[in-house]
Amino acid sequence: ELLQNSGNPCCDPVTCKPRRGEHCVSGPCCDNCKFLNAGTVCWPAMGDWNDDYCTGISSDCPRNPVFK
């Protein structure tokens, strides 16, 4: 993983953690080293599932368990 993140401007090349002052390295809710705002669609609705939204505090995209 160190080699995978070595060119990432958000990643400290020694620790592979976010650089000082940055929130995240990668993920569907990470953009330019910062968490996307809460309510940003990170996975659009498909089939019977509703949209999934960023929380604003994580780079992960939590699944919305609510069906249409």
Swiss-Prot record:
Protein task: Extremely potent and selective inhibitor of integrin alpha-5/beta-1 (ITGA5/ITGB1). Partially inhibits adhesion of cells expressing alpha-IIb/beta-3 (ITGA2B/ITGB3), alpha-V/beta-3 (ITGAV/ITGB3), and alpha-4/beta-1 (ITGA4/ITGB1) to appropriate ligands only at concentration higher than 500 nM. Weakly inhibits ADP-induced platelet aggregation.
Record's miscellaneous remark: The disintegrin belongs to the dimeric disintegrin subfamily.
SUPFAM superfamilies according to UniProt: Blood coagulation inhibitor (disintegrin)
Keyword Secreted assigned: yes
Disulfide linkage: C10-C33, C24-C30, C29-C54, C42-C61
Domain of life of the source: Eukaryota
Family to which the UniProt record says this protein belongs: Belongs to the venom metalloproteinase (M12B) family. P-II subfamily. P-IIe sub-subfamily.
GO molecular function, one term: toxin activity
Source lineage: Eukaryota, Metazoa, Chordata, Craniata, Vertebrata
Pfam families: Disintegrin (PF00200)
Residue ranges of domain Disintegrin in the record: 1-68
Subcellular location: Secreted
Keywords for the protein's UniProt record, in alphabetical order: Cell adhesion impairing toxin, Disulfide bond, Hemostasis impairing toxin, Platelet aggregation inhibiting toxin, Secreted, Toxin
Subunit structure: Heterodimer with EMF10A; disulfide-linked.
GO cellular component, as recorded: extracellular region
Segments carrying motif Cell attachment site: 46-48
Tissue: Expressed by the venom gland.
Annotated protein name in UniProt: Disintegrin EMF10B
